[in-house]
Amino acid sequence: MRRRDLLAGAACMAVSSLVPRVGAARGRTPYGGRILLHAPWPLNAIDPHRVDDMAAAFFGDALFETLYARDADGAFIPSLAEGDPQPDGATLRITLRSDIRFAAGARVDARAAAASIARARAHDAAAWLADVPAPHIDKGVLVFAMRDARRLVRALASPLVAIVPPRFAPDRPDGTGPLRVEIQAAGMVLSRNGIAASGPAFLDAIDVRRAADLVTSLRDFESGADDMGWLGSFLHDPRPGAKSFDAGVIGWAILRTGRDAAAADTPGTAQALADGIPHAALAPLVVGSPWDQGSATWTGAPADLVVRDDAPWLVEVARALCAAMSQPSHEVRCVTLPAAEIAQRRASRGFALMIDVARPIGPGPLGALVGLATADDPASAMALARHPPRGDVAPRVATRTMRIGVVGEIKLQGGRAPDVVLPPSPWGRGVDWGNAFRSR
């Protein structure tokens, strides 16, 4: 039995009836053990309310939860909320469960939830929450001045609207998920959260260590030191008994154009340049299926393509792009910069070209579209969320009207030890780490 399967049957029950069922589930699934892996991504902070936080994309669902969650069948069910929104005149009222606490011990109440929703809106969830008014609190209940319960639940179920405590600090993250996290110099340790809102994880811990390059994970997995291999199963020789896993697309590497790109800084140019890169140039980085290659090339003056220096996978993407885009008199040079400087340049648009990341904000094509639009321009994303296009729009098509272009997919896949079981996330993107276990 999966941990989150318990939520569907227990949403309207008292917590006293939930605990024995969690215990029963533990009897059928091996309990304990650790997983060790190396990740070529920044691991010094994690913020669920940011569309460019890949640590949150990979591990956020294990640490943070939302008022409503998605079950294995794709339906939305109460999670931190006690039940469905209740109509009251022209408003909807949401009561939180009274038994829940953050991993650090503070209570999760209506004030904390309202503050967290406000924080999400102030960061990257504003467009996704465009039709959701800020709640007020009445007798410990969240009150939303709207009538559409289905729309409210869908909005509040987004991972970018996860509930975090007041004064949340990304370098000291705290949540209600099945695992809690400690940021360390070598990476992050996700350990079982004994007071998790939907039950603690099966595993004792997941050690995620920072990889300085793309070789480290493959080498250590091949030798048996690691339990998972990032993007592959071996460096030289296959590991005996190793299994593969593919947890799908959790985001995109994107190309940005900035003010220093001069005439190339126009909507659609970034995607045209990205489409002009041969798939073969990026295929070793596992960026998804081939695309229809275009003919656009960089025709501007020699320029720098900047990328944050603490994301080895992203640096390799940038280097591959520079090699593919450069031509005599139109060279593109890869320049690595500290994350803080990348953020400053992104805010001021003080660059020619930049490699960055984005992730979906919600489910389905609309969630992907709003995530990309938010990465491009939050104001435009707001308008798009209120008036979405008809039908499904592929990411590479959607960005033809933006100053960003999809370079390739960011996938969570590779090799795993034969006894490591990695269930898929109910969102269809990533691993359900709370339900991961080691078979015996």
Positions of PLM-derived features:
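Detector for C-terminal structural segments
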Residues: 185, 272-297, 313-322, 346-440
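N-terminal lobe/hinge region of extracytoplasmic solute-binding protein
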Residues: 38-89, 118, 174-176
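Extracellular/periplasmic solute-recognition and catalytic clefts
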Residues: 182-189, 207-260, 357-358
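Gly/Pro-rich hinge or "lid" segments in bacterial periplasmic/extracellular proteins
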Residues: 150-207, 212-216
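Surface-exposed binding/hinge segments that line
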Residues: 85, 93, 126-168
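Aromatic- and charge-enriched surface segment that lines or borders ligand/interaction sites
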Residues: 59, 83-124, 220, 263-265
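A structural "hinge/loop" feature
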Residues: 41-57, 80-81, 106, 152-161, ...
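Alpha-helical secondary-structure segments
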Residues: 109-116, 143, 204-205, 223, ...
